[in-house]
Amino acid sequence: MRIRTIGLFIGAALVVGCAGTPGPGDAGYPYNVDGDYSGSFTVDGLTFTGTMQISTQPGGAVTGTLSLNRPVQINGTIDGTLTGDQLTVGIKYGSNPATGCSGGTVEGALTISEHGASISGPVTVVDCGEMLDATINFSR
């Protein structure tokens, strides 16, 4: 009986020890970003509005799409990494009717609110070879 009790105790300790705290992409992680977000992207005094559809994969990889629709249509793909409450993001977009350029990039470190309700922060845009400071502010 004593050996059985010790075995049950060790088994319970292993289960508790292996459960651990969820990491990026795991169910229950407080900063996962998943779903549809709407908001603004402000660059050089011009505010664009639109949507992002994103998801966090196991290990913290983040993928998705960006669709800005006002004042012009710009579409891009999102790739990033979630660490803690920070999303290091890279966005590649196609044609920009506002500048006439055939595409550009956006990079930055965004802050995620708890439960992934909002995504915001400064980014750098490279469009037509010019670097511009910008701000992203999206929420569910």
Model features per residue range: what roles?
Residues 19-22:
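Bacterial signal peptide processing site
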Residues 27-116, 120-140:
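Central antiparallel beta-sheet cores of small beta-barrel/beta-sandwich binding domains
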Residues 15-17:
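C-terminal motif of bacterial Sec signal peptides marking the signal peptidase cleavage site
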Residues 11-13:
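Repetitive helical segments and hydrophobic/amphipathic motifs
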Residues 1-8:
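Bacterial N-terminal signal peptides that target proteins for export
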